[in-house]
Amino acid sequence: MTATATEHVATAGATGRIARVIGPVVDVEFPADAIPSIYNALTTEITLNGQTKTITFETSQHLGDNLVRAISLQATDGLVRGTTVQDSGAPISVPVGDGVKGHIFNVLGKPLDVEESEIKADAYWPIHRKAPSFASLEGSTEMLETGIKVIDLLTPYIKGGKIGLFGGAGVGKTVLIQEMITRVARNFGGTSVFAGVGERTREGNDLWVEMEEAGVLKDTALVFGQMDEPPGTRLRVALSALTMAEYFRDVQNQDVLLFIDNIFRFTQAGSEVSTLLGRMPSAVGYQPNLADEMGLLQERITSTKGHSITSMQAIYVPADDYTDPAPATTFAHLDATTELSREIASRGLYPAVDPLTSTSRILDPQYIGKDHYNTAVRVKQILQKNKELQDIIAILGVDELSEEDKIVVSRARRIQQFLSQNTYTAKQFTGVEGSTVSIKDTVEGFTAICDGELDHIAEQAFFNVGGLDDVERNWAKIQEQTK
């Protein structure tokens, strides 16, 4: 934080007046001896259509001449020059502790599903906090098993790590992160925190219902800054959720799951705020402090000695361009990246994870074992060879390939089908129950395909199945139908 705690308290209760309103940006004049510190929360009351409401701002700039520039966290309709503004003397604070579980909050920590008096918080923590010191950090290489074949085999997740789900519009990011909540939170048995950054109301409602049905809502806190809210709200909502997660990690010594959907909208909100503050834009119109803003968030999402925050973050890729500064800045902070492919999604193969571009820090024999590693490498080699042969196939046809290449293409097609899997979240669309496959069964299944043990089975038998038992059942049905 820029200011010390002493400086924050010194200006508590100071009164200023609004000098200018430009949309969500407000300039406020304070006495010379009571200028609010950066990040201080300011409040004012307005009456609109017969209703009185409190508007909260966050101090963002000192302009000189006793003026501060603040960003509103609510709509500024009805706000006029000369309105009195109070300095709280402290940053925005949110409730933390067991009392937040099972409830939905906004960026200010106000519950959206119950009255505020019903929340029994252990404490209120400011959302702007320092990242843990280097001495307190602890690295982790333990695998987090999800039961999804393509992820466990090719891009294994790390307990206490940061995981990114990258993809363009409509390729299944939100469905996959909801699937992770259903699977990991249910099997994890600990505390989860969900940050909806620029979330659609429909998606938020779907998530609430699914978590209730899965029985994980009672151990989860949800914090939403919806798509129709001001950019200041969308910029800070991830910090509000992270603060709740940090309390569970640091005070209650718990392992915490933190889900963020969507990091791109966090970046987008930062860009909007930067423009409103009059900063000169940087590459592709993004804010000049993009890397700094991302670092302030990501450096706090970490594991400390004895307890961890495991983070799963959905990241929208504008126009499927991975060189865009927003996704590119996020890459450096992640331990595992799962890239969703539009081309794979167009073939109806879900989850549409690209097996060749997705990565993991622990895809190494010393962490996951030789069998797992060797199978993952063989699968990638077959898929890469198949990709290289596609131009020849498109021009000359499969018949012009050598016998060896024909076998590679045949096995690659079976692998591609076997990487697809029914999910619990998608049951409402497909009518088919989801499946969970252990890492042992996953490795055995793909090893069998690579070794040619399943060359006699038609490739359609591998589509949207769990383990090899499902493949055998499908193959038996296909044979029965063709008799």
UniProtKB/Swiss-Prot annotation:
Query: Is Cell membrane among this UniProt entry's keywords?
Result: yes
Recorded catalytic activity of this chain's protein: ATP + H2O + 4 H(+)(in) = ADP + phosphate + 5 H(+)(out)
Q: Which residues bind ATP?
A: G167, G168, A169, G170, V171, G172, K173, T174
Bilayer-crossing regions: none
**Which CDD domains would you find in this protein's record?**
ATP-synt_F1_beta_C, ATP-synt_F1_beta_N, F1-ATPase_beta_CD
SUPFAM superfamilies found in the cross-reference section: C-terminal domain of alpha and beta subunits of F1 ATP synthase, N-terminal domain of alpha and beta subunits of F1 ATP synthase, P-loop containing nucleoside triphosphate hydrolases
Cellular location(s)? Cell membrane
Q: Give GO MF terms, alphabetically.
A: ATP binding; ATP hydrolysis activity; proton-transporting ATP synthase activity, rotational mechanism
What is the top-level taxon of the source organism?
A: Bacteria
Primary localization = membrane
List the InterPro entries.
AAA+_ATPase, ATP-synt_VA_C, ATP_synth_F1_bsu, ATPase_a/bsu_AS, ATPase_alpha/beta_chains, ATPase_F1/V1/A1_a/bsu_N, ATPase_F1/V1/A1_a/bsu_N_sf, ATPase_F1/V1/A1_a/bsu_nucl-bd
Entry EC number(s): 7.1.2.2
Cited Gene3D superfamilies: 2.40.10.170, Bovine Mitochondrial F1-atpase, Atp Synthase Beta Chain, Chain D, domain 3, P-loop containing nucleotide triphosphate hydrolases
Recorded GO CC terms: plasma membrane; proton-transporting ATP synthase complex
SMART domains annotated for this entry?
A: AAA
Query: What membrane topology does the annotation report for this chain?
Result: Peripheral membrane protein
UniProt keywords, alphabetically: ATP synthesis, ATP-binding, Cell membrane, CF(1), Hydrogen ion transport, Ion transport, Membrane, Nucleotide-binding, Translocase, Transport
Q: Which family does it belong to?
A: Belongs to the ATPase alpha/beta chains family.
Q: How does it assemble?
A: F-type ATPases have 2 components, CF(1) - the catalytic core - and CF(0) - the membrane proton channel. CF(1) has five subunits: alpha(3), beta(3), gamma(1), delta(1), epsilon(1). CF(0) has three main subunits: a(1), b(2) and c(9-12). The alpha and beta chains form an alternating ring which encloses part of the gamma chain. CF(1) is attached to CF(0) by a central stalk formed by the gamma and epsilon chains, while a peripheral stalk is formed by the delta and b chains.
Q: What does this protein do?
A: Produces ATP from ADP in the presence of a proton gradient across the membrane. The catalytic sites are hosted primarily by the beta subunits.
**Name of the molecule in the record:** ATP synthase subunit beta
